[in-house]
């Protein structure tokens, strides 16, 4: 490598010496129409030596000799221009103060020399790039022919990477929807209308690379257009990573709130001692990561799953001096009290819960004990140990619940919010499904596709709301930041998604139209439509994605008695109905 660099330096240095001397000679020759009077020979030779030293010096200063052929760009051309301009300026100053030494000397030769030397030195360096660019390219066996969608700077970067062979792609054309760009050049390609994709598909091209920055709705529309044209492999080019990645279902479905407020969350968490229950779950682990990200002083991670706790502890191992993993069930009040007395958290983020509807239907007693009694024990212990704020993660399934899980979460809302007072601020945050959470529909579909199995869903009309887990958790923390105590916050999850449409899109993205979709029938307690969430009577907050739902406190003595009854009753569904009158238990499914 050192030899190669030395060889390159020697080549460029030798070439530049020849070209600089040649440009001085040609400058004089052009000035005198090819016949240089002998009287000017002295001035020409002196100026050639001085200009040679000055130009080489400035080219070294601007690090031009460290640039390889293939990395020569407009930026390097600009540096050469400035280096040569400064060299000519310094020569002019020398000439101005020591003109007698040069006389006679034609001043116009300075300008001509500058133009020629820039042309020669720049052309030398760009020559290899030009040869590579204009050399007819042939597709290698391992490369995939593709269409580039979007005549942008991203596209130019993509085309450059493809030429260098770093992407495994072989672009055959560039298309764009903007009429003003049609017929212009993007690299060596003439930009064509999107409709041209049809003819490329007929020629066997099945891959499209999106080189545009698009909003989600625009991306969804473009994806559908590309599929309609016959494209079966859609990728998005990442400029920062210099790679073309597969478009994902998350790109097409996830709601991405525009009112995420990092500063508010940082102010809320910075230098605080925070306890997260259910720390190893999908929501809990993201809460832990964001607590560390936004400057929590100490994070206590509580979970009763050894594996989940190990996983999040390992993920945050770089911050081990700031985290404490506690393997503990929140049903163990004595141990929980010891933890709170030892670490004195100022904030508890309660994410521990059983969340899977079918399992809770089959194990209603366990759902009641874990969700309701566990929440009650944690909330009571927090208040007794003077924790300042308690934020509980709730669910859209708590709205007019039809299943045991949703109803237990509604009871948790009633209990925790009724415990709120001026010394113990409690808030609950409801939201829908997060993309990729354990046991949810998207990982299930991905596994079925990987195993060549049909995609199963319970009803063709079933719909759900989706949000990326990181965005949902940040909105939870923003809600916690603005909570004064007693609020039932609701997150705007965007538009509902039909699960059958989700299944079809995932098959398209996987190029697996050979797999079928099977309808299995609604399960016990399952809703067709989650009744999320935003009601016209809900109060707005400073964030457009966060609302406050109406909620009434209940008599705690009465609620405590009903919770005691839940633990010993024979019919849990009936006992829950006494607490939550709007509970309409779908025991049979469809």
Swiss-Prot record:
<feature type="binding site">
    <location>
        <position position="355"/>
    </location>
    <ligand>
        <name>NADP(+)</name>
    </ligand>
</feature>
<keyword id="KW-0472">Membrane</keyword>
<dbReference type="Pfam" id="PF02719">
    <property type="entry name" value="Polysacc_synt_2"/>
</dbReference>
<feature type="binding site">
    <location>
        <position position="355"/>
    </location>
    <ligand>
        <name>substrate</name>
    </ligand>
</feature>
<feature type="binding site">
    <location>
        <begin position="434"/>
        <end position="438"/>
    </location>
    <ligand>
        <name>NADP(+)</name>
    </ligand>
</feature>
<feature type="transmembrane region" description="Helical">
    <location>
        <begin position="101"/>
        <end position="121"/>
    </location>
</feature>
<keyword id="KW-0456">Lyase</keyword>
<dbReference type="InterPro" id="IPR003869">
    <property type="entry name" value="Polysac_CapD-like"/>
</dbReference>
<feature type="binding site">
    <location>
        <position position="526"/>
    </location>
    <ligand>
        <name>substrate</name>
    </ligand>
</feature>
<feature type="binding site">
    <location>
        <position position="351"/>
    </location>
    <ligand>
        <name>NADP(+)</name>
    </ligand>
</feature>
<feature type="binding site">
    <location>
        <begin position="280"/>
        <end position="283"/>
    </location>
    <ligand>
        <name>NADP(+)</name>
    </ligand>
</feature>
<dbReference type="InterPro" id="IPR029063">
    <property type="entry name" value="SAM-dependent_MTases_sf"/>
</dbReference>
<dbReference type="InterPro" id="IPR051203">
    <property type="entry name" value="Polysaccharide_Synthase-Rel"/>
</dbReference>
<dbReference type="InterPro" id="IPR036291">
    <property type="entry name" value="NAD(P)-bd_dom_sf"/>
</dbReference>
<protein>
    <recommendedName>
        <fullName>UDP-N-acetyl-alpha-D-glucosamine C6 dehydratase</fullName>
        <ecNumber>4.2.1.135</ecNumber>
    </recommendedName>
</protein>
<feature type="transmembrane region" description="Helical">
    <location>
        <begin position="80"/>
        <end position="100"/>
    </location>
</feature>
<keyword id="KW-1133">Transmembrane helix</keyword>
<feature type="binding site">
    <location>
        <begin position="393"/>
        <end position="394"/>
    </location>
    <ligand>
        <name>NADP(+)</name>
    </ligand>
</feature>
<comment type="pathway">
    <text>Protein modification; protein glycosylation.</text>
</comment>
<dbReference type="GO" id="GO:0016829">
    <property type="term" value="F:lyase activity"/>
</dbReference>
<comment type="function">
    <text>C6 dehydratase involved in the bacillosamine biosynthesis pathway by generating UDP-2-acetamido-2,6-dideoxy-alpha-D-xylo-4-hexulose from UDP-N-acetyl-alpha-D-glucosamine. Involved in the N-linked protein glycosylation pathway.</text>
</comment>
<feature type="binding site">
    <location>
        <position position="409"/>
    </location>
    <ligand>
        <name>NADP(+)</name>
    </ligand>
</feature>
<dbReference type="GO" id="GO:0016020">
    <property type="term" value="C:membrane"/>
</dbReference>
<dbReference type="GO" id="GO:0006486">
    <property type="term" value="P:protein glycosylation"/>
</dbReference>
<feature type="active site">
    <location>
        <position position="397"/>
    </location>
</feature>
<feature type="binding site">
    <location>
        <begin position="303"/>
        <end position="308"/>
    </location>
    <ligand>
        <name>NADP(+)</name>
    </ligand>
</feature>
<feature type="binding site">
    <location>
        <begin position="329"/>
        <end position="330"/>
    </location>
    <ligand>
        <name>NADP(+)</name>
    </ligand>
</feature>
<feature type="transmembrane region" description="Helical">
    <location>
        <begin position="42"/>
        <end position="62"/>
    </location>
</feature>
<keyword id="KW-0812">Transmembrane</keyword>
<feature type="binding site">
    <location>
        <position position="441"/>
    </location>
    <ligand>
        <name>substrate</name>
    </ligand>
</feature>
<feature type="transmembrane region" description="Helical">
    <location>
        <begin position="9"/>
        <end position="29"/>
    </location>
</feature>
<feature type="binding site">
    <location>
        <position position="433"/>
    </location>
    <ligand>
        <name>substrate</name>
    </ligand>
</feature>
<feature type="binding site">
    <location>
        <position position="523"/>
    </location>
    <ligand>
        <name>substrate</name>
    </ligand>
</feature>
<feature type="binding site">
    <location>
        <position position="458"/>
    </location>
    <ligand>
        <name>substrate</name>
    </ligand>
</feature>
<comment type="similarity">
    <text>Belongs to the polysaccharide synthase family.</text>
</comment>
């Amino acid at each position: 490598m050192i030899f190669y660099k030395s060889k390159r330096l020697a080549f460029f240095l030798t070439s530049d010496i020849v070209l600089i001397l040649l440009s001085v000679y040609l400058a004089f020759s052009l000035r005198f129409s090819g016949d240089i009077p002998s009287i000017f020979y002295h001035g020409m030779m002196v100026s050639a030596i001085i200009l040679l030293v000055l130009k080489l010096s400035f080219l070294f200063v601007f690090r031009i000799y460290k640039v390889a052929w293939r990395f020569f760009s407009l930026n390097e051309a600009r540096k050469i221009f400035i280096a040569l301009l400064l060299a000519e300026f310094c020569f002019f100053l020398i000439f101005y103060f020591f003109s007698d030494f040069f006389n006679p000397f034609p001043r116009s030769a300075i300008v001509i020399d500058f133009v020629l030397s820039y042309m020669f030195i720049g052309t030398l360096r760009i020559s290899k790039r030009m040869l590579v660019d204009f050399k007819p390219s042939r597709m290698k066996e391992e490369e995939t022919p593709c269409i580039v969608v979007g005549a942008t700077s991203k596209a130019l970067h993509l085309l450059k990477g493809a030429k260098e062979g770093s992407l495994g792609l072989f672009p055959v054309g560039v298309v764009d929807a903007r009429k003003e760009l049609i017929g212009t050049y993007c690299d060596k390609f003439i930009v064509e209308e999107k409709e041209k994709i049809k003819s490329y598909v007929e020629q066997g091209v099945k891959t499209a690379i999106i080189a545009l920055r698009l909003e989600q709705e625009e991306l969804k529309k473009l994806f559908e257009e590309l599929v309609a044209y016959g494209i079966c492999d859609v990728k998005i080019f990442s400029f920062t990573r210099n790679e073309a990645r597969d478009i994902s279902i998350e790109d097409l479905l996830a709601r991405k709130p525009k009112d995420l407020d990092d500063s508010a969350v940082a102010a809320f968490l910075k230098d605080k001692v925070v306890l997260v229950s259910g720390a190893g779950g999908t929501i809990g682990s993201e809460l832990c990561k964001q607590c560390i990200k936004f400057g929590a002083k100490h994070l206590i991670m509580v979970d009763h799953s050894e594996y989940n706790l190990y996983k999040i502890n390992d993920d945050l191992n770089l911050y081990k001096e700031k985290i404490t993993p506690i393997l503990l069930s929140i049903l163990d009040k004595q141990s929980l009290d010891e933890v709170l007395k030892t670490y004195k958290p100022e904030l508890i983020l309660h994410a521990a819960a059983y969340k899977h509807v079918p399992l809770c239907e089959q194990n209603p007693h366990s759902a009641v004990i874990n969700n309701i009694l566990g929440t009650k024990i944690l909330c009571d212990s927090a208040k007794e140990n003077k924790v300042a704020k308690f934020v509980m993660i709730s669910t859209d399934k708590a709205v007019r619940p039809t299943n045991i899980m949703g109803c237990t979460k509604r009871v948790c809302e009633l209990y925790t919010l009724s415990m709120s007072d001026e010394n113990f601020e409690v808030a609950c945050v409801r939201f829908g499904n997060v993309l990729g959470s354990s046991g949810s529909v998207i990982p299930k579909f991905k596994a079925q596709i990987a195993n060549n199995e049909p995609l199963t869903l319970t009803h063709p009309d079933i719909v759900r709301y989706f949000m990326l887990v990181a965005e949902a958790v940040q909105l939870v923390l923003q809600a916690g930041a603005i909570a004064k105590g007693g609020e039932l916050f609701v997150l705007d999850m965007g538009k509902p998604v039909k699960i059958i449409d989700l299944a079809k899109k995932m098959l398209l993205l996987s190029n697996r139209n050979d797999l079928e979709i099977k309808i299995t029938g609604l399960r016990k307690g399952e809703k067709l439509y989650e009744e999320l969430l935003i009601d016209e009577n809900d109060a707005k907050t400073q964030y457009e994605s966060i609302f406050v739902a109406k909620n009434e406190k209940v008599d705690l003595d009465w609620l405590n008695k009903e919770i005691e009854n839940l633990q010993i009753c024979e019919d849990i569904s009936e006992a829950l109905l006494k607490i939550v009158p709007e509970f309409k238990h779908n025991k049979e499914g469809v």
